[in-house]
Amino acid sequence: TGETFEENAITKASVPAKLGYIGIADDSGLCVSALNEAPGVYSARYSGGDDEDNNDLLLKELENKTDRSAKYVCVMACVFPDHQNDFTVRGECHGEILKERHGTAGFGYDPLFYYQPFDKTFAEIDLAKKNEVSHRSIAIKKFVEKIKEIM
């Protein structure tokens, strides 16, 4: 694991590029302000357990914190065999971490990630609506625009 989402996405996308193909990859996670942007690149294995364990640890670490602001981050990388047009794009979705889980849809930290414009957690939002505003959808839109510029 690299130290940043950018490093990880580039590392993943570099594998096909070494074989002569265009490599496209992403890395994503949750960054919580009060925890110095943790879990960050370690989001999937924050607790060493599953999603429930990760959520439990996050709640425990935020127990006495007043600042519960957080963001989901997705970085997409495109690596070319000749490295002439390599790029990354970053999508972010800002919210806050609730004190208890709400909703059952989604995965990961979605039951704790409150998105104010919809007044719901990501686990309570319809998937189509979530896909309009998520960090991944923002990154994908930026990625498509960048590809159009290059091609």
Role assignments for model-derived ranges:
Residues 1-151:
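Anionic-ligand binding patches
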